[in-house]
């Protein structure tokens, strides 16, 4: 299966490396795409070593392939964004395409798998919840964050699911109908 893994700029971005490894070990072709802020939290090289592909980001050379976002959206059997920050969630909810990942997501013609990760107060914010409901109504598959100790020191709902849980929900459970449902 051809999989796009979108990595956004949050502290939980390091977990995407394990998710990449799980997918590659299972025989999936994985193309990692970073948002500009992902670079502040994780390095590209480990993702490139595991996936065997160059990580694409907003600095992708559009001159060598000006419609790369369309080509990749057509190539992908599945698009997973893990972690999904409140910032990128808002962009997706309102159709903003200001970086390579959000542009690719708009071009993809199937449901996105969205694994949320953010501070508990951000997650509870009315605007974040409205964006979440909008994405659910559009048919995207929401992998809700778990509760526990967060990077900020708070305890609450906002932790990115463990990579093994994300993998299971995205691949082992694909026969179930998750259309517009909040998983977990």
Residue ranges and their predicted role:
Residues 1-113, 120-184:
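A cross-family phosphate/adenosyl-ligand binding-site feature
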